[in-house]
Amino acid sequence: MSTQVLIVGGGIGGLTLAAMCRRIGVSCRVLERSAALEPVGAGISLAPNALRALDQIGLYDYVRQEGQPVRKIRVYRNQTQWSEIDFQWLERTFGYPVYSIERHGFHRRLYDAAGGSETVNLGAEVAKVIPPQEEAEGVSVVLKDGRRYTGNVLVGADGVRSVVRRALMATINSPPGQSGAVGEDEDAADVIQFTGRVHLSGYTHPLDHLGPADEGIAYWMLYDRSILTTWPCRDHRQWFVGAVPSKLKDPNRSVWKHADHNTINQVYGSEYHPFAPDFHFRDVVKHAERVVASDVFHQTTFPPMAAGRIAMLGDASHAMTSFFGQGACQAIEDATELASALGMIDVRPTDAETILQGYRHSRERRGRDLVVFSDRFALLHTGRLLGSWGPFVRQMVYTWMPLWGWKWALQWLYGHQPTLVEQRNEAAKKTA
C-alpha cells in the first residue's frame, strides 16, 4: 500500500503533521502501535510558539474552548510564597497565552483533524524499515503482522525509542546502495539517557471549593525533597506533575504500570499546597480521575533530523525534560516546518532529499537549544544550577527577577512561531 508520506507514530507530533498534510492536500498514512486511543498522560501545555500553527489548521478554537489560559504562577518554597509571576502579558506580546488542557481530549481532536480512521491505522506496530535501494523508490515499512506500506517519504514520530531513528542512522552509516532493512531489535548507539527522575502526574475532577479567583493560577511548589507543579485547567480541574529522584534499578521503561493514588501520596500526600482544603496535597490527589508515573529521558547526542527520504520530529529527534512544558510544542513546531517541506516535495518530488535537508537545517539548532534550555531550567528549578550555589541562584531568580526579565528570557522561545507554507503563500499574495 503506497502513499506520499508514511508517518510512524500517532502522538501529538505525528497527528499534527497528518492534519497539516491533509490541509495542504498531501496524502499520508499514520501507523500507530497502540490498538486504541486511550487516555495517556494527564495534561498538556500549549504555548504561543505552537498555538499559531494550531490556529492555522483550525484547532485554536478547540483549545480556547477546552483549555484554561494561565494568568499567573505563584512560586512557593515549602509553605512560604516567594513570588507571583504575571503571565497575562503573553497574549498582548505574542498573540496567544499559555494554555493548560487535558491531554486525551486534545489528542482525540488531533486524531479527528488528521482524518480519523481513514488516515490513522491503530494497532500498526512497525517491525522493520526498508530504505530505498534506488533514488526513485520510496521507503517501506513492514508491520509485525506482515503488512507492508510504502511512502515517498518516511517520518519518524515514534518517540524516544524510535525504530525510524535507527533506520535513519543506518541510512547515514551505510555505503551508497547498501542500506538494508532495519528492525526494532537492531543494536544502535542509544541517543537518549535516563535523567534519574520520575514524573508523577495526574488530572483531577472539578474541585468544587475553588472559585473565580483561582482561575488561571498555577503553582510551582519547591519542597525540600521534591518539586510539584499544579496547572489550572477548565472547570477548576487541576493537572499536577511532580519530579522526584527515581529508585528504580532498571530505568528502561517509560510509563510505570499500576501507578495509583497511593503512588502519588507516598511522595506528596503530606506536602503543603495552598488550595488544598486542609493544605495537604492528598486532598487534591483523591479527586484525580487518573494518575501517571513515568521515567524522564533526555537527548544526549543528536542524530540528523533527515537523511535520504527519512525525516524525524519530536521526541524521536530531540527528547527533552518537561520542566518548561515544551515537548509537545516542539513537536508541533517540527510538524509545521516539515509539512511545509512536504508541500514542496509534492510539487517537486525529485527534489525530496534536498528539500528534507532544508527542513533538517531549519529545525536542528532549535531542537537542540530547547533540550539544553529544558535541562538548565530543570537544574535551576531543582536548586542544582551552578552546583552548591544552586539554592541561592534559584531563590534570587524566583524572588528578585522583575517582569521585564521574564519578558526578555521568553522572547526567543515564544516569539518563534513557524507558519505553514500555504499561509506564507497567501500572505505573500496579499502584500504583492
From Swiss-Prot:
TM regions (residue ranges): none
GO BP, one annotated term: secondary metabolic process
Residue runs in coiled coils: none
Pfam families for the chain: FAD_binding_3
EC number(s) reported in the record: 1.-.-.-
Binding site for FAD: E32, R103, D315, A328
Pathway where it operates: Secondary metabolite biosynthesis
Assigned keywords, A-Z: FAD, Flavoprotein, Monooxygenase, Oxidoreductase
Broadest EC class assigned to this enzyme: oxidoreductase
Knocked-out gene: effects: Leads to the accumulation of pyranonigrin I.
Cofactor: FAD
GO MF terms, alphabetically ordered: FAD binding; monooxygenase activity
Classification via InterPro entries: FAD-bd, FAD-dep_Monooxygenase_BioMet, FAD/NAD-bd_sf
Physiological role: FAD-dependent monooxygenase; part of the gene cluster that mediates the biosynthesis of pyranonigrins, a family of antioxidative compounds. The first step of pyranonigrins biosynthesis is performed by the hybrid PKS-NRPS synthetase that condenses 6 malonyl-CoA units to an acetyl starter unit, to form a 1,3,5-trioxotetradecane-6,8-dienyl-ACP. The enoyl reductase (ER) domain of pynA is likely to be functional during the first two rounds of polyketide chain extension, to generate the saturated C-C bonds of the alkyl side chain.
Annotated family: Belongs to the paxM FAD-dependent monooxygenase family.
Protein name: FAD-dependent monooxygenase pynG
